[in-house]
């Protein structure tokens, strides 16, 4: 077993994320289109006119069952993209945006959220997934209050988004969304980015188009919910949430973050709009987190990761140990977690 310290930093030059392609997931099926792309439309007068109940429809909602999906839809879409272009993607590391977000924010995680990752090398790339079994350990079924918190986040997306730009939407489409029950369909953007010397391909769910006039990932928006801020504790909770929101938006190149604030009984009280690049300023005075420090930590961690042997189908596990400020690396026995369709495609190239 080897390890490296989480106190290590490596100054990083950055390249702007560039969208390579996108895809939709509908009822679990991947299609190389924008059928699940949504558009933001929630005028202030709509919020002021009458309280929007973010628990409406919860009695008819079934929380999506989590299961171990590895990198399956990302690799399925990548194999489709490469078949169309006839060339292999230029990247050293391939993973989900959410995984890099967890690594990036680890130095400032006050909750000591466990991070256990599996890594394999194949055909010129390191692939990173979160270990499913480790992620499930200690998880408890949400109580009624937590279920309302979870649902209100999904519901905010339903009431704030349209299937088409507002000027193409009918009055019925605009008004009926308040009765919609959220489902698990997704729109995913796949971008190529570079942090330091690390060339990365990441996929991440995108909530909506916020600025239709912008191009690429600059047009996208990320929707978040949080309780109203009434005291210092509420403010600190929001600052920490903003850290995660900033990191995940920064990695994908999303320029806009929209916060919906809920009351104690889960009514939508107000909406705030932020530019992703401005969020680190909100942590400046209290020093709850530093965007620059997180980028440098991510760069150091990914650079260490690339020291692993470039031998096809070998498996390793990375365990982030907050208490001892280190990351342990062990070699694993077992089969690759890569999608067979993708592996077969690469072998046929």
UniProtKB/Swiss-Prot annotation:
Biological process, per Gene Ontology: cleavage in ITS2 between 5.8S rRNA and LSU-rRNA of tricistronic rRNA transcript (SSU-rRNA, 5.8S rRNA, LSU-rRNA); deadenylation-independent decapping of nuclear-transcribed mRNA; mRNA processing; NAD-cap decapping; nuclear polyadenylation-dependent rRNA catabolic process; nuclear-transcribed mRNA catabolic process; positive regulation of termination of RNA polymerase II transcription; termination of RNA polymerase II transcription, poly(A)-coupled
Keywords for the protein's UniProt record, in alphabetical order: Hydrolase, Metal-binding, mRNA processing, Nuclease, Nucleotide-binding, Nucleus, RNA-binding
Metal-binding keyword on record: yes
Subcellular location per the Swiss-Prot or TrEMBL entry: Nucleus
Entry's EC annotation: 3.6.1.-
Cofactor info, note text: Divalent metal cation.
Residues the entry annotates as binding a divalent metal cation: 157, 207, 222-223
Gene Ontology CC entries for this record: cytosol; Las1 complex; nucleus; RNA polymerase II termination complex
Superkingdom of the source species: Eukaryota
Plastid listed as a keyword: no
Binding residue positions for substrate: 205, 224, 248
Signal peptide: none
InterPro entries, per database record: RAI1 (IPR013961), RAI1-like_fam (IPR039039)
Cofactor(s), by name: a divalent metal cation
Alphabetized GO MF terms: enzyme regulator activity; metal ion binding; mRNA 5'-diphosphatase activity; nucleotide binding; phosphodiesterase decapping endonuclease activity; RNA binding; RNA NAD+-cap (NAD+-forming) hydrolase activity
Top enzyme category: hydrolase
Family affiliation: Belongs to the DXO/Dom3Z family.
Function: Decapping enzyme for NAD-capped RNAs: specifically hydrolyzes the nicotinamide adenine dinucleotide (NAD) cap from a subset of RNAs by removing the entire NAD moiety from the 5'-end of an NAD-capped RNA. The NAD-cap is present at the 5'-end of some RNAs and snoRNAs. In contrast to the canonical 5'-end N7 methylguanosine (m7G) cap, the NAD cap promotes mRNA decay. Also acts as a non-canonical decapping enzyme that removes the entire cap structure of m7G capped or incompletely capped RNAs.
Record protein name field: Decapping nuclease RAI1
The organism of origin for this protein: Yarrowia lipolytica (strain CLIB 122 / E 150) (Yeast)
Gene name, Swiss-Prot/TrEMBL: RAI1
């Amino acid at each position: 077993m080897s390890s490296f310290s989480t106190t290590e930093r490596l100054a990083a030059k950055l390249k702007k994320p560039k969208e390579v392609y996108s895809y939709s997931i509908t009822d679990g099926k991947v299609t190389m289109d924008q059928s699940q792309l949504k558009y933001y439309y929630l005028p202030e007068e709509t919020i002021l006119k009458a309280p929007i109940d973010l628990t409406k429809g919860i009695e008819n909602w079934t929380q999506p069952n989590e299961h171990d999906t590895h990198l399956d839809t990302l690799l399925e879409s990548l194999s489709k993209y490469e078949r169309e272009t006839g060339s292999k993607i230029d990247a050293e590391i391939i993973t989900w945006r959410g995984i890099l977000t967890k690594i990036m924010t680890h130095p400032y995680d006050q909750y000591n959220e466990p991070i256990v990752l599996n890594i394999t090398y194949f055909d010129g790339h390191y692939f990173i997934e979160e270990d499913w079994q480790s992620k499930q350990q200690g998880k408890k079924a949400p109580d009624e209050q937590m279920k309302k918190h979870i649902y209100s986040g999904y519901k905010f997306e339903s009431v704030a988004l349209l299937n088409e730009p507002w000027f193409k939407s009918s009055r019925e489409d605009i008004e009926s969304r308040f009765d919609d029950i959220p489902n698990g369909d997704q729109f995913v953007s796949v971008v190529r980015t570079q942090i330091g010397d690390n060339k990365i391909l990441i996929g991440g769910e995108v909530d909506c188009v916020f600025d239709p006039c912008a191009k690429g990932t600059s047009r996208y928006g990320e929707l978040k919910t949080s309780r109203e801020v009434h005291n210092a504790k509420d403010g600190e909770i929001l600052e920490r949430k903003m850290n995660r929101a900033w990191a995940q938006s920064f990695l994908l190149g999303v320029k806009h973050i929209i916060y919906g604030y809920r009351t104690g009984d889960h009514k939508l009280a107000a909406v705030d709009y932020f530019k992703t690049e401005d969020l680190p300023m909100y942590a400046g005075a209290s020093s709850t987190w530093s965007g620059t420090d997180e980028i440098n930590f991510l760069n150091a961690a990914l650079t260490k990761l690339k020291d692993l042997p470039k031998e096809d189908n070998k498996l390793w596990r990375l365990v982030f140990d907050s208490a001892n400020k280190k990351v342990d690396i062990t070699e694993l026995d077992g089969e690759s977690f890569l999608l067979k369709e993708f592996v077969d495609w690469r072998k046929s190239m």
